[in-house]
Amino acid sequence: MLSVACFLAFAPDSYLPMLARSFLVQWTALFLILSIVFLWYRSWWSASSALLGTALLAIQIPVPEAPEPDASTGSMLRVLHMNVWQPNESYGSAIEEALSSEADVISIQEVDRHWARELTSRLGPSYPYARIEPRSNCYGIALFSRLPFERVSTKFLDGTPLIEAWFNVGGRSVRVISVHATSPISYEHFHQRNRQLDGLVPIVAATAIPTILVGDLNTVPWDGAFGRFCSRSGLQATQVKGSRTWPSLGPLALIPLDHVLLSGRASATSITSFHVPGSDHRGLLAEIKLPRHAP
């Protein structure tokens, strides 16, 4: 039992350990339950092993924190992100969820031509500025905005599109990047996802203006690839309690695959998850403060 915990906590950052560690919170809960069961039956050695395993796993998990109150003045930007799940045909109810958020910018992922048509028709009147890159392979992407783009472009990471948009918010430029990294469902896809995260680094680091990166990165905050990406790009994670997004199980989800990452002294005053009708992901809604004297 202790050897399993050591494997989960200290195994090299490779494909199979990465898959197992994705559910580290659930593994920790299982070890804790086992320790209670062993204590109940007075199996002291097994209980000690399970408790030690619980501790080894628990210290690997970043503790979600509530955003700190920020008394500084500055502009606010409300950003919504949702992975709609390409086969999902609940177009109207999913789009209504986005509209009801009153977000300034909406990032949508897994957009095919059917979703592109529905999004343009239903979101277009309220969000007239849009960039849509539909795909049939679950990696189509779209960005809708109430605010006009200063400029917007599509870039590619190992063949997968991302959208980079610049806005003027309160008299300063702000950048929003929407990206959907490859799901590591195989050994090759695992390496492709890591190459994409590596390729994101120079894009993010190319400017010092406040940047908001949103998307399904198909990695968890305690994954080595995620930590390296944040460290090298200068982005800061904004994990908070209740930010787990996949798989969507009604009001719950198991692991945080979708992220809101910030740089340039931008800060999140709140991040909440919400149900996306028909999708296997929960969405994220972030309130972002842009300090007056941010670079």
Regions found by a protein language model. Name each.
Residues 1-122, 292-294:
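N-terminal, active-site-proximal structural segment of metallo-dependent hydrolase catalytic domains
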